[in-house]
């Protein structure tokens, strides 16, 4: 596995050049931090969320495919191909049954990491049985369900939820230098609250859902001066708009890896 990882890491810009054929200069620039901004310690962690104008990722009935358009779907597949691991929560797997592969673009599949603290997912979901890529099931120490045959399992302390820092350390130890946190809202929010994201991509679709499953939710600010502000870039994704936030130098003075709230765990 580590030898395979080294092969992925060597020549990343060259691999990206083939993957990004047909993309304009602006889109190519969106992906440049994946090889130009690797931290000295630990993996580069990039979060992504696709939402409506009014901040929802799904309807009240749970319908979420697809809030954003085709261009953003291709973008997520490129991100998977350029990263070593893709992380999703159990809610995303239960609602969407995603494959988390790179079937829409030329490029390697990442390690699929599913966070399921209480082991409520069945073995019937595609990430556990399709054999398209490796899957790591992350669950709490207290989860009582049996492991899933053919799926690697990692148990983490779960006094108040999964220890996300320990997860990133484990992924880095196995050679994952780029980690893509793809969803859903609770999972991305947990990484953001803990100060574990280096970048955050928010793709906004031109539609209003009205009510439903919320997008990012973080601790509220008493005043605008206390809000998290970050340098950002804006990219067109067809009819959608993607905001790429650089959290390496946050407006609140914190840097990735700084625990702002103690909430570096996910329920």
Labelled PLM ranges:
Residues 1-267:
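Enzymes that bind and transform nitrogen-containing heteroaromatic metabolites
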């Amino acid at each position: 596995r580590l030898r395979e990882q080294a092969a992925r890491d060597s020549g990343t810009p060259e691999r990206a050049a083939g993957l990004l054929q047909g993309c304009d200069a602006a889109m190519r620039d969106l992906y440049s931090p994946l090889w130009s901004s690797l931290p000295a310690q630990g993996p580069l962690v990039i979060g992504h969320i696709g939402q409506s104008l009014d901040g929802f990722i799904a309807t009240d009935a749970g319908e979420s495919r697809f809030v954003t358009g085709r261009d953003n779907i291709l973008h997520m597949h490129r991100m998977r191909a350029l990263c070593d691991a893709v992380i999703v929560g159990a809610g995303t797997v239960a609602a969407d049954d995603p494959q988390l592969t790179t079937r829409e673009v030329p490029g390697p599949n990442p390690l699929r990491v599913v966070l399921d603290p209480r082991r409520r997912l069945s073995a019937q979901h595609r990430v556990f049985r399709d054999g398209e890529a490796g899957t790591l099931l992350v669950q709490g120490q207290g989860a009582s369900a049996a492991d899933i045959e053919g799926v690697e399992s990692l148990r983490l302390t779960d006094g108040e939820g999964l220890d996300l820092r320990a997860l990133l350390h484990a992924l880095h130890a196995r050679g994952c230098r780029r980690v893509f946190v793809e969803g859903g809202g609770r999972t991305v929010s947990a990484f953001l609250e803990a100060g574990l994201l280096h970048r955050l991509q928010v793709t906004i679709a031109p539609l209003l859902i009205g009510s439903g499953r919320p997008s990012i939710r973080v601790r509220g600010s008493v005043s605008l001066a206390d809000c998290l502000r970050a340098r950002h870039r804006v990219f067109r994704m067809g009819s959608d708009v993607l905001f790429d936030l650089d959290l390496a130098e946050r407006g609140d003075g914190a840097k990735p890896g700084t625990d702002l709230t103690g909430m570096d765990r996910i329920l």
